[in-house]
């Protein structure tokens, strides 16, 4: 069914300057902000009330448009410290953003640029002034939607062409997006977490551990929390082979988050991960890294109905018996029924009982679906980094 949804009356305008055109033919009108042009992508909703800059720069959102359920986005502006993609000039992250209210002038002591100008520099197209919660309900009922977001300050759109492009885009399934966002060469990292009124600290102390981080679309705050454990980090591209990694003599290996279909990335990632498992080097994965680890042990991943995106998701850790509130950002999940006997499920989502963690019995190997580094979000799961380093210390004693 084709329909056009005008912007609600409080934000109504004479001529829309931005559109969201869904693959089913629905056209949603509003005001444009940020970059001009158009972009095809999957539309998801995020329920976080803060951290829009971190969300929009997370490489895991590659080829996605983020619909924010919180109405006021942009109030605190933007700054150079809250960006999450490894190389900001590459602008890896969301291609579009949807807000209920217009972007206002920022009010925050850390702000050095307003959101509208920042979106232009990041080449992110924004749609403002629509009923974002109605769109959220649509996604919840119909599942993740494919569509196209378009912005023209003059309001000139060829809607038929936009509809055809939206219908032609096939979605995230079978897309290996890690190759598009990964670093192109190895690099070092020594920045530690942010300190109030002091910014980010550099790890100049003598390092006790060497961690190799495989970059499938890694977030900066993950690296900072690893560096906080007296570790120096070597970041390597997603397709780095096992011989190159072992030659670096790591004390532990980290499998990062990232975008796209894990089954597509698995073609080159799984053989390396399987060899790492056999090496008995401690291994820790987050998000896409978790899914790739599951594929490496013979499990399967599946596309979710709507995915999990937000900073308020309850997860249970079966090891501690505790419930944690965590940040999540994924559209694929591990099929629990496909886990082999030597792999134990360690975490589940209390929203839908989907898998959120696993470990290999008898191996120093584990992973989680959620984001313990948060950024944005709660810090309930920070202990997982210590769990990783506990395994590393045990490994070094016997190595």
Curated annotation (Swiss-Prot):
UniProt GO molecular function: ATP binding; carbamoyl-phosphate synthase (glutamine-hydrolyzing) activity; glutaminase activity
Protein name: Carbamoyl phosphate synthase small chain
Assembly with partners or alone: Composed of two chains; the small (or glutamine) chain promotes the hydrolysis of glutamine to ammonia, which is used by the large (or ammonia) chain to synthesize carbamoyl phosphate. Tetramer of heterodimers (alpha,beta)4.
Protein task: Small subunit of the glutamine-dependent carbamoyl phosphate synthetase (CPSase). CPSase catalyzes the formation of carbamoyl phosphate from the ammonia moiety of glutamine, carbonate, and phosphate donated by ATP, constituting the first step of 2 biosynthetic pathways, one leading to arginine and/or urea and the other to pyrimidine nucleotides. The small subunit (glutamine amidotransferase) binds and cleaves glutamine to supply the large subunit with the substrate ammonia.
GO biological process terms, semicolon-separated: 'de novo' pyrimidine nucleobase biosynthetic process; 'de novo' UMP biosynthetic process; glutamine metabolic process; L-arginine biosynthetic process
Catalysed reactions listed for this entry: hydrogencarbonate + L-glutamine + 2 ATP + H2O = carbamoyl phosphate + L-glutamate + 2 ADP + phosphate + 2 H(+)
Enzyme Commission numbers on file: 6.3.5.5
Positions bound to L-glutamine: 60, 258, 260, 288, 291, 329, 331-332
Chain ranges of the Glutamine amidotransferase type-1 domain: 210-398
């Amino acid at each position: 069914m084709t329909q056009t949804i005008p912007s609600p009356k409080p934000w109504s305008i004479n001529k829309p300057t931005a559109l969201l055109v869904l693959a089913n033919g629905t056209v949603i009108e509003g005001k444009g902000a940020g970059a001009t042009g158009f972009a095809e992508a999957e539309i998801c909703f995020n329920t976080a009330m803060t951290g829009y800059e971190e969300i929009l720069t997370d490489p895991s959102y590659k080829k996605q448009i983020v619909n924010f359920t919180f109405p006021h986005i942009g109030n605190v502006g933007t700054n150079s410290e809250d960006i999450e993609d490894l190389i900001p000039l590459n602008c890896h992250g969301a291609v579009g953003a949807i807000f209920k209210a217009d972007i206002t002038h920022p009010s925050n002591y850390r702000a050095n640029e307003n959101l509208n100008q920042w979106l232009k520099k990041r080449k992110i197209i924004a749609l403002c002034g629509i009923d974002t919660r109605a769109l959220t309900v649509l996604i919840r009922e119909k599942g993740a939607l494919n569509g196209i977001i378009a912005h023209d300050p003059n309001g000139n759109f060829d809607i038929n062409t936009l509809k055809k492009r939206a219908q032609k885009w096939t979605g995230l399934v079978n897309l290996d997006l890690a190759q598009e966002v990964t670093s192109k060469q190895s690099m070092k990292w020594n920045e530690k977490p942010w300190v109030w009124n002091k910014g980010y600290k550099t790890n100049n102390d003598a390092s006790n551990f060497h961690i190799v981080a495989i970059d499938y679309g890694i977030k900066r705050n993950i690296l900072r929390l690893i560096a906080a454990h007296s570790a120096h980090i070597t970041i390597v591209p997603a397709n780095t082979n096992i011989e190159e990694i072992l030659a670096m003599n790591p004390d532990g290996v980290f499998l990062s988050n990232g975008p796209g279909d894990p089954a597509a990335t698995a073609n080159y990632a799984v053989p390396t991960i399987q060899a790492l498992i056999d090496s008995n080097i401690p291994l820790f994965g987050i998000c896409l890294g978790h899914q790739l680890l599951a594929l490496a042990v013979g499990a399967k991943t599946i596309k979710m109905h709507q995915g999990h995106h937000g900073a308020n998701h309850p997860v249970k850790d079966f090891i501690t018996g505790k419930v944690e509130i965590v940040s999540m950002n994924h559209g694929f999940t591990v099929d629990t029924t496909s886990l082999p006997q030597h792999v134990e499920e360690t975490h589940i989502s209390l929203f839908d009982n989907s898998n959120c963690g696993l470990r290999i019995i008898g191996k120093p190997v584990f992973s989680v679906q959620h984001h313990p580094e948060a950024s944005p979000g709660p810090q309930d799961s920070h202990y997982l980094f210590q769990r990783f380093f506990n395994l590393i210390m045990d490994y070094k004693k016997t190595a």
